[in-house]
């Protein structure tokens, strides 16, 4: 919801916001995703800003309607302008967030909001978008290592994720784990972003993200030990999903 994005539902006003949430939930949505901000710039002081896609009334209406229906919402938000409004409205996850500032991080940490950084997609699109006249993703690439380190230090919870589009899906989606490790997480902590942390974010603790009796049998097998070589996650030899083998290296 929000902004002129293909196949997205636009709203104007709090009543339309509530109606849009209800419509999506009637279609069976478990989560609502909103596009919280747009038009990113880097200021002379090094901070990033953006334009908000929603008024506070619209944002709060989305949050209250979603949470009141016992569902959750995630926000595509790059800077404090989209992040703070979304978190205060009840967002459970901030998607991308590459231009977040310290106040955003502190608020997210205090409220237990997850950050889904989607680092590889930014790296993938940065050069191409810069050639087309939009260098903001290159700027994010330069600042994100310190942003990530600060967020971890301040206690922001990290969840692994990809994106709905923007890059070649045939490329290894596990590159984010290498970024996580190079910027301070241990290999175990990096893998937990896609297991126990993801389960917590999705409200499925005990069902996914761990190997134990009663949980879904979602298991992968590798030739190398990822605690010693995190890049081995980019070459998965065997995949089981809910007890069914989908990939078996011959």
PLM feature segments, named:
Residues 1-71, 106, 111-131:
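Divalent-metal coordination cores built from histidine and acidic residues
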Residues 33, 93-95, 116, 221:
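Conserved beta-strand positions in the central sheet of alpha/beta enzyme cores
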Residues 68, 72, 141-225:
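His/Asp/Glu-enriched, well-ordered alpha-helical/loop segment
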């Amino acid at each position: 919801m929000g902004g002129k994005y293909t196949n997205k539902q636009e709203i104007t006003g709090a009543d339309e916001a509530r109606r849009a949430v209800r419509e999506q939930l009637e279609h069976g949505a478990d989560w609502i995703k909103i596009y919280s901000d747009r038009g990113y710039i880097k200021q002379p002081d090094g901070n990033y800003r953006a334009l908000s896609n929603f008024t506070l009334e619209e944002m709060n209406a989305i949050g209250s309607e979603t949470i009141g229906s016992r569902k959750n919402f995630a926000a595509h938000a790059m800077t404090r302008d989209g992040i703070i409004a979304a978190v205060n409205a009840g967002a459970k996850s901030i998607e991308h967030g590459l231009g977040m500032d310290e106040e955003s991080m502190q608020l997210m940490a205090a409220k237990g909001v997850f950050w889904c950084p989607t680092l590889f997609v930014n790296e993938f699109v940065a050069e191409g978008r810069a050639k087309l006249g939009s260098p903001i993703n290159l700027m994010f690439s330069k600042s994100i290592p310190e942003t990530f380190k600060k967020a971890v230090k301040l206690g922001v919870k990290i969840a692994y994720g990809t994106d709905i589009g923007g890059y070649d899906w045939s490329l290894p989606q596990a590159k984010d784990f290498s970024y996580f490790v190079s910027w301070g997480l241990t290999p175990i902590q990096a893998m937990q972003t896609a297991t126990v942390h993801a389960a917590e974010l999705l409200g499925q603790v005990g069902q996914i993200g761990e190997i134990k009796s009663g949980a879904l049998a979602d298991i992968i097998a590798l030739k190398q030990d990822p605690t010693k070589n995190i890049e081995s996650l980019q070459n998965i030899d065997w995949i089981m999903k809910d007890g069914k083998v989908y990939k078996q290296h011959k």
